[in-house]
């Protein structure tokens, strides 16, 4: 049974389902959960005459996005009485899947749990998939928890 479970979070509905599944497994096995949110610092064009505040603002926004997600994960872990930790990780241009895999290895995780959406066709091709990249390169078991987009929302896009 899995005792050290690592879950990647991004604030999406599928990530919440993945968190719930990781907690369920940890509760059944007497294990613990490590939750991680990767903060991506995307390159931005900067007006040299204006200085660099826009870039810093983008970094602050990226870090701020992680806070409610990790706070939610911490509260769910506490509510379910499952031991765990939450972490924000900086990617700084590195592939998100690589950051997650490295951190899971550092945590000596038995299992990586990730959410994945039910995107198809061009949307999936354009957006890519961190979960798929991680699955292809992982050196330990990976559980993908799928969240299908509602049909009406998918058609509207």
Language model regions located:
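Acidic, proline/glycine-rich short linear motifs
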Residues: 38-68, 103, 151-157
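Short, flexible loop segments at boundaries between secondary-structure elements
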Residues: 140-152
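Structural beta-alpha unit
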Residues: 75-112, 150-157
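Glycine-rich, Arg-bearing micro-motifs that act as flexible, cationic patches
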Residues: 111-133, 151-155
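Small/aliphatic-rich secondary-structure junction motif
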Residues: 3-55, 76-85
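Short, well-ordered secondary-structure micro-motifs
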Residues: 18, 45-48, 96-99, 124-125, ...
């Amino acid at each position: 049974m899995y005792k050290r479970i690592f879950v990647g979070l991004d604030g999406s509905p599928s990530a919440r389902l993945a968190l719930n599944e990781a907690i369920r497994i940890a509760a059944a096995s007497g294990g613990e959960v490590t939750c991680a949110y990767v903060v991506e610092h995307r390159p931005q064009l900067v007006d040299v005459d204006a200085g660099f505040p826009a870039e810093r603002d983008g970094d602050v926004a990226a870090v701020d996005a992680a806070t409610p997600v990790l706070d939610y994960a911490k509260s769910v872990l506490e509510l379910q009485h499952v031991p765990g930790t939450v972490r924000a990780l900086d990617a700084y241009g590195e592939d998100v899947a690589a950051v997650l895999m490295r951190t899971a290895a550092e945590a000596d995780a038995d299992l990586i749990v990730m959410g994945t959406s039910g995107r198809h066709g061009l949307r999936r091709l354009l957006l890519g998939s961190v979960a798929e990249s991680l699955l292809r390169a992982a050196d330990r078991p990976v559980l993908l928890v799928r969240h299908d987009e509602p049909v009406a929302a998918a058609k509207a896009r």
